Curated annotation (Swiss-Prot):
Induction: Induced by genotoxins such as ultraviolet-C radiation (UV-C), and ZEO and MMC treatments. It comes from Arabidopsis thaliana. ATP binds at residues 38-45, 70-72, 115-118. Substrate binds at residues 147, 191-195, 200. Pfam families: TK (PF00265). Pathway: Purine metabolism; Pyrimidine metabolism. The active site is at 116 (proton acceptor). This is Thymidine kinase a. One of its GO terms (cellular component) is cytoplasm. Disruption phenotype: No visible phenotype. The double mutant tk1a tk1b is seedling lethal.
Length: 238
């Protein structure tokens, strides 16, 4: 009896729900998520812009997004380290984009590019909605790790839902070999510290380790110096 009920349910789903669902999918088209990641100065934004321009050349409607936190080169453009720019929407979050862009205009979009994706806390949710529910192509560019080589934001979280993942490398500023990591030049410990070549540099494994040790040692010296200075000031006032 249970088998008959299950069989009836499957047939019902096949004929009604599944048919409507597949029909809806065909109308919307097939969505996709493509991830471009790597350290700073590895050409992520350049690669993203190249992909976006290719989509435009193929006649697709495109929108570019970036985090409003990134104001290094321009507030309303995605700009590469080489100075190449492309107009974009600068947003504090992603899920509000369809409404801000206008639902009619949003529904006509084929492709959405996202730069500096590590700054968006709702990246996973947005990519699922855009690709799975709305049938659009999402091309995401962002850092895969922070200056401590830990997961940064939600970029790594979207790998399980990605159709493709491209990991780029930079060139080590010390030896010229392939660079997989981002080294912070100063002793600031904030996870989010927006900057360019004045704050960060790409390095290989060897020079990440050696330079990181030096920076940590320098930080300790500064902390000890500040502590000694503070103790000296306290002693002088007693």
């Amino acid at each position: 009896m249970a088998t008959l009920k299950a069989s009836f349910l499957i047939k019902t789903l096949d004929s009604d729900v599944t048919g409507d669902f597949l029909s809806d999918l065909e109308r919307r088209g097939s969505g996709a998520v493509h991830v471009i990641m790597g350290p700073m100065f590895s050409g992520k934004s350049t690669s993203l812009l190249r992909r976006i321009k290719s989509e435009i050349s193929d006649g697709r409607s495109v929108a570019m997004l970036k985090s409003s936190k990134d104001t290094r080169y321009a507030k309303d453009s995605v700009v590469t380290h080489d100075g190449i720019g492309f107009p974009c929407w600068a947003l504090p979050d992603l899920m509000s984009f369809p409404e801000k862009f206008g639902l009619d205009a949003y529904n006509k979009l084929d492709v959405i590019g996202i730069d500096e994706a590590q700054f968006f806390g709702d990246l996973y949710e947005f990519c699922c909605k855009v690709a799975d529910d709305d049938g659009k192509i999402v091309i995401v560019a962002g850092l895969d790790g922070d200056y401590l080589r830990r997961s940064f934001g939600a970029v790594l979280d979207i790998i399980p839902i990605a159709d493709s993942v491209t990991k780029l490398t930079a060139r080590c500023e010390v030896c010229g070999h392939k660079a997989f990591f981002t080294l912070r030049k100063n002793c600031d410990t904030r996870t989010e510290l927006i900057g360019g070549a004045d704050v960060y540099m790409p390095v290989c494994r060897k020079h990440y380790i050696t330079n990181h040790i030096v920076i940590k040692a320098s930080k300790k010296v500064l902390e000890d110096s500040d502590k000694a200075r503070a103790e000296s000031c306290v002693a002088a006032t007693i």
